[in-house]
Amino acid sequence: MDMDLNNRLTEDETLEQAYDIFLELAADNLDPADVLLFNLQFEERGGAELFDPAEDWQEHVDFDLNPDFFAEVVIGLTDSEDGEISDVFARILLCREKDHKLCHIIWRE
């Protein structure tokens, strides 16, 4: 893949894109009770956090996950307002290069 550092999604755009994908696909991939829980609790405890891709993504994809071009977004619920996401509903791997639309999701089981 030929990618351009000057043609990347910003961190905010990456988070927004991941959240939009999550909302579109959650009902088909999560237990209905989890979808209900997420929808009821998101306003108070919901969050999306951006990370460099975790090493375990290499078990799911067969290409180099250069953190300049790939990001992992974790979507879920926190235990406190300032806390980290403790109740993960999805981990989303996105390519941040705008011309390479690529997304992989590990859903809560």
From Swiss-Prot:
It comes from the Bacteria. It holds the Pfam family DUF440. Coiled coil: none annotated. InterPro entries: dsDNA_mimic_put (IPR007376), Put_dsDNA_mimic_sf (IPR036763). HAMAP family: Put_dsDNA_mimic (MF_00680). Belongs to the putative dsDNA mimic protein family. NCBIfam families: PRK05094.1. May act as a double-stranded DNA (dsDNA) mimic. Probably regulates the activity of a dsDNA-binding protein. This is Putative double-stranded DNA mimic protein YciU. The lineage of its organism: Bacteria, Pseudomonadati, Pseudomonadota, Gammaproteobacteria, Enterobacterales. The gene is yciU.
